[in-house]
Amino acid sequence: DCEFVVQSAVLHDIGIGQTRSLGLGCTGNLPYVCHGVEGRAILDRLGLERHGLVCERHVGVGISARQTVQRKLPLPVRDMIPLSVEERLICYADKFFSKTDDGRHEKTIDEITAGLARYEAEYADRFLSLHRMFSREPDHQEQGRSGWER
């Protein structure tokens, strides 16, 4: 659904204003990791529930209930992993540019996976699964598990 992807791409970070990310000009009170859940709440109130799920599920490469508990994240304990192809596409595309460098540097696959692996190897596996799904290039870092079955 191309129209939905475009709309969701514009809206997926709407919750960032509720977070405290001074480097991004955000003076809210919540940790940055909460921007997806906050975005979902905003869009749900506007009747845009499907778009809200994109907000909630794009953070990192999705966050499972297990990871929320294990890492003591200030998030609801539920799986927030992208499920639809549209959710997965926005999650994938979101990893290539950072808000902190004014979007001037497109990250490589290696940079993205290294950054995600700092948090948990499963995150890098999930990203590589997305890369296989959306890339036309052969996967240069074939990994065993897809990362989606957890």
Question: Locations of the language-model features?
Answer:
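Charged phosphate-binding loop/patch that engages nucleotide di/tri-phosphates or the phosphate backbone
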Residues: 118-150
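Divalent metal-dependent catalytic cores for phosphoryl transfer on phosphate-bearing substrates
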Residues: 1-110
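C-terminal/domain-terminus segments
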Residues: 104-126
